[in-house]
Regions:
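N-terminal, polar/charged subdomain of small-to-medium soluble alpha/beta proteins
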Residues: 1-108
Length: 108
């Protein structure tokens, strides 16, 4: 299973360094959840504010969405990745806890 990352610029073309930073940061989400299949990064600029939205799709039809706005696009990217890390870790814990039952206790 390969990870596909799509990056879209809206209203402005961002420099390659910003695009590389975004791809590098979101790629780290696979550390927390290895079932990530697709990541869509949307970089936007309206007026003086940058907006970054990241949509992560994983196995079992799981979707995670993070959004941030700031004057600095790099700060936006970092904030979005932090939000998504929390979402992904929480979802993984929920899946892990769901599979952990009272199996041995029920038999006794």
């Amino acid at each position: 299973m390969s990870l596909r990352i799509d990056l879209t610029d809206r209203h402005k073309t961002h420099p390659d360094s910003v695009r590389e930073h975004a791809v590098e940061k979101v790629s780290k989400l696979t550390r927390y959840f290895d079932q990530v299949q697709h990541i869509e990064i949307i970089l936007d600029k309206e007026h003086d504010q940058h907006a970054v939205e990241v949509i992560v799709t994983a196995n079992r039809h799981l979707h995670f969405v993070g959004h941030a706005t700031d004057d600095n696009v790099l700060t936006c990217i970092d904030r979005v990745v932090d939000k998504l890390e929390r979402q992904v870790v929480k979802a993984k814990e929920r899946i892990k806890d769901h599979h952990r039952g009272d199996g041995a206790r029920k038999q006794a």
